[in-house]
């Protein structure tokens, strides 16, 4: 029987499936951070259980670390306790930890792929909703809750029901300057923020194959924002070239054997999907969200929509509420909306290609008066590479703040946050009410679009910035 990539990955990992019961899956990699793991380790301790497979468990600090100092005390009491607990737990249970002073420390979904922890064909879990990022490698990756974190630590398995399948095909080639972030925002604009609920999405089509691994990670990272359980891109030469030579990747003949298997990780011809969505890449322009969920998104050259234009009464009410929170009036051009802060970072857009794209806009320009702009690399290696390329100097000369790695202003869990009423052009993944700080107003954009907003003081079409 013809199978989708998701079905192949799922079936390959079933340990046990009793009749009328949820299948038990083997988990190849477990990524751990300081926020969702303390109670899980406490549970192990209470029952006298070890970590079943410490060699398949990798920990880092990211959510509530300071991006201005490596001092563990810098982000408050709760952050300090969580980080100290992670240090204690990893030491006690034999788990490798990339702590604040480790050169590989960074956002968990940047660190995993970068170190070759993430490989095609794997099942990967983390106590974090954006674990879908790793699906860019053709791995089945999804977020789990703290009780499930404990279950995986104890057994290296997890009960998981089968999801529905969804194919999203982006046909043709994207125009110059259009990024994976624009593509995925356009997709969510079409499906809505619940369009993928109950599904595992496979992205395909020429525009997807054209993306680098970093672009594919951005794409899969945001699949959760349309309600999907996980996202996949079938592995190809782009994937194999990225993985080759990384710290935890197979070496020599083992790598060649792995690639031979990875090449089988494709959806079979004739396999059927429960849902199919198609977009034309050439129709996608730079995207900016205007509301309080990622599906409330328009082209940078559009006007803020009028809630009355939505036929669905639920959408209309949602739009009215969103505009009131965002402090926007219907009908005004988006390019006239001024911003207070800019955040370039997060597990969506903090990799080296993202920073290069932002630096290209920032070079030779200055951050607009009254705007605070942060650039937060996703990991120690990203920061080191950016500095080797001189990107830090470009940003600093333009008036951006060059920070240490961490989740930073993506979520109000550390010192980087918005004040009430402040408007931010952000490369992160969620524009919910209060996500970046109580009363903060978040607009999601690509790194180049964020840099353009920083230097102009408002949203601007990067295609018009010479």
UniProtKB/Swiss-Prot annotation:
<dbReference type="InterPro" id="IPR050067">
    <property type="entry name" value="IPM_dehydratase_rel_enz"/>
</dbReference>
<dbReference type="InterPro" id="IPR018136">
    <property type="entry name" value="Aconitase_4Fe-4S_BS"/>
</dbReference>
<dbReference type="GO" id="GO:0046872">
    <property type="term" value="F:metal ion binding"/>
</dbReference>
<comment type="similarity">
    <text>Belongs to the aconitase/IPM isomerase family. LeuC type 1 subfamily.</text>
</comment>
<keyword id="KW-0432">Leucine biosynthesis</keyword>
<feature type="binding site">
    <location>
        <position position="410"/>
    </location>
    <ligand>
        <name>[4Fe-4S] cluster</name>
    </ligand>
</feature>
<dbReference type="InterPro" id="IPR004430">
    <property type="entry name" value="3-IsopropMal_deHydase_lsu"/>
</dbReference>
<keyword id="KW-0100">Branched-chain amino acid biosynthesis</keyword>
<dbReference type="InterPro" id="IPR033941">
    <property type="entry name" value="IPMI_cat"/>
</dbReference>
<comment type="pathway">
    <text>Amino-acid biosynthesis; L-leucine biosynthesis; L-leucine from 3-methyl-2-oxobutanoate: step 2/4.</text>
</comment>
<dbReference type="InterPro" id="IPR036008">
    <property type="entry name" value="Aconitase_4Fe-4S_dom"/>
</dbReference>
<keyword id="KW-0456">Lyase</keyword>
<dbReference type="InterPro" id="IPR015931">
    <property type="entry name" value="Acnase/IPM_dHydase_lsu_aba_1/3"/>
</dbReference>
<dbReference type="GO" id="GO:0009098">
    <property type="term" value="P:L-leucine biosynthetic process"/>
</dbReference>
<feature type="binding site">
    <location>
        <position position="347"/>
    </location>
    <ligand>
        <name>[4Fe-4S] cluster</name>
    </ligand>
</feature>
<dbReference type="GO" id="GO:0051539">
    <property type="term" value="F:4 iron, 4 sulfur cluster binding"/>
</dbReference>
<feature type="binding site">
    <location>
        <position position="407"/>
    </location>
    <ligand>
        <name>[4Fe-4S] cluster</name>
    </ligand>
</feature>
<keyword id="KW-0028">Amino-acid biosynthesis</keyword>
<protein>
    <recommendedName>
        <fullName>3-isopropylmalate dehydratase large subunit</fullName>
        <ecNumber>4.2.1.33</ecNumber>
    </recommendedName>
</protein>
<keyword id="KW-0408">Iron</keyword>
<dbReference type="InterPro" id="IPR001030">
    <property type="entry name" value="Acoase/IPM_deHydtase_lsu_aba"/>
</dbReference>
<dbReference type="GO" id="GO:0003861">
    <property type="term" value="F:3-isopropylmalate dehydratase activity"/>
</dbReference>
<keyword id="KW-0411">Iron-sulfur</keyword>
<comment type="function">
    <text>Catalyzes the isomerization between 2-isopropylmalate and 3-isopropylmalate, via the formation of 2-isopropylmaleate.</text>
</comment>
<keyword id="KW-0479">Metal-binding</keyword>
<keyword id="KW-0004">4Fe-4S</keyword>
<comment type="subunit">
    <text>Heterodimer of LeuC and LeuD.</text>
</comment>
<dbReference type="Pfam" id="PF00330">
    <property type="entry name" value="Aconitase"/>
</dbReference>
């Amino acid at each position: 029987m013809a199978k989708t990539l998701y079905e192949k990955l799922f079936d390959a990992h079933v340990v046990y499936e009793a009749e009328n019961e949820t299948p038990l899956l083997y988990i190849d990699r477990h990524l751990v951070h300081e926020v969702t793991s303390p109670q899980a380790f406490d549970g192990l301790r209470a029952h006298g259980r070890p970590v079943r497979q410490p060699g398949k468990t990798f920990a880092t600090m990211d959510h509530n670390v300071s991006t201005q100092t490596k001092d563990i005390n810098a982000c408050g009491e709760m952050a300090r306790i969580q980080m100290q607990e992670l240090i204690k737990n990893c030491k006690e249970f034999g788990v490798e930890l990339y702590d604040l002073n480790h050169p590989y420390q960074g956002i968990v979904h940047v660190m995993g792929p970068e170190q070759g922890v993430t490989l095609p064909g794997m099942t990967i879990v983390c106590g974090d909703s954006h674990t879908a990022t790793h699906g860019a490698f053709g791995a089945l990756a999804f977020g789990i809750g703290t009780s499930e974190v404990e279950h995986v630590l104890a057994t290296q398995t997890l009960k998981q029901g089968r999801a529905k399948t969804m194919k999203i095909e982006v046909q043709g080639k994207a125009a110059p300057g259009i990024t994976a972030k624009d593509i995925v925002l356009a997709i969510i604009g079409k499906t809505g923020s619940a369009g993928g609920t109950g599904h595992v999405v496979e992205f395909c089509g020429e525009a997807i194959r054209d993306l680098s691994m970093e672009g594919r990670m951005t794409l899969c990272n945001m699949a959760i924002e349309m309600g999907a359980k996980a996202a996949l891109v079938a592995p190809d030469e782009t994937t194999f070239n990225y993985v080759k030579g990384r710290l935890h990747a197979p070496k020599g003949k083992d790598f060649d054997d792995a690639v031979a298997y990875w090449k089988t990780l494709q959806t079979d011809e004739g396999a059927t999907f429960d849902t199919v969505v198609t977009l034309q890449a050439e129709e996608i322009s730079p995207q900016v969200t205007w509301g309080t969920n990622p599906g409330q998104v328009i082209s940078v050259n559009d006007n803020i929509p009028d809630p009355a234009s939505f036929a669905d009464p639920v959408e209309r009410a949602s739009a009215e509420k969103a505009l009131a929170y965002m402090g926007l009036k219907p009908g005004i051009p988006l390019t006239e909306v001024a911003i207070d802060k800019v955040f370039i970072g997060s597990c969506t857009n903090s990799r080296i290609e993202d920073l290069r794209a932002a630096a290209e806009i920032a070079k030779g320009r200055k951050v607009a008066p009254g705007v605070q702009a942060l650039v937060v690399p996703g990991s120690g290696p990203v920061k080191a590479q950016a500095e080797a390329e001189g990107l830090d100097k470009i940003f600093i000369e333009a008036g951006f703040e060059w920070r240490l790695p961490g989740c930073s202003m993506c979520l109000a869990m550390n010192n980087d946050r918005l004040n009430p009423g402040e408007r931010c052009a952000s490369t992160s993944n969620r524009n919910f009410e209060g996500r970046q700080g109580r009363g903060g107003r978040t607009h999601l954009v690509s790194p180049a679009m964020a840099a353009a907003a920083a230097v102009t003081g408002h949203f601007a079409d990067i295609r018009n910035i010479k």
